[in-house]
Amino acid sequence: MYGRRKGIPDGIGGEMAAIEVHGIGTKEDPWQLKTPSGTGEYQMYQDEAADPPALVCTVGTTVLRYQLRCLDDLHEMLRKHADWMLLGSADEQKPAAEGTVEAWGRSAENPVGGWYGLKKGLRGRFGMYVPPLMEALGLAEVEHNPKNNRIRAI
């Protein structure tokens, strides 16, 4: 489990996280998260048995899957960036704004050489759904404004 791998106890939240989060990141007890603007709710859990291991995101009835390694890779990129970065969320069919987390999550220059999203047609919105989990895990700080939110590594 990601939490144990990083030394973060199950049931993250409270002092370990920058935001209050419920759930432990399993299919049976997923993390309950909110979008950076606070207007949308969704769930995430890690599926380490998947090939490749996946971060499963459920938004209403839509299920998105991202490579689980995106958490470590994004944290490392943000540490090297050493400043705030715009999230820039966009659907797969729309271009991502240059220099955003969304653009990095689909760039040929990232560690996986392209999309972290695993299901064609549902590979976007990386910049919307992954950063709040990064914040909950204590890996990043995320702004919570109505729009144009940013992230930086902790």
State what each model feature region is.
Residues 3-15:
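Short, Lys/Arg-enriched N-terminal segments with co-localized hydrophobic residues
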Residues 19-90:
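Long, low-complexity, charged/polar intrinsically disordered regions in eukaryotic proteins
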Residues 93-112:
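Short acidic, glycine/tyrosine-flanked loop/strand segments centered on an H-E-D-like triad
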Residues 107-125:
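Short helix-coil junctions and helix-kink-helix linkers
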Residues 121-136:
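Short amphipathic alpha-helical interaction segments
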Residues 135-145:
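A short, conserved structural fragment
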Residues 145-154:
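Short, cationic-aromatic polyanion-contact patches
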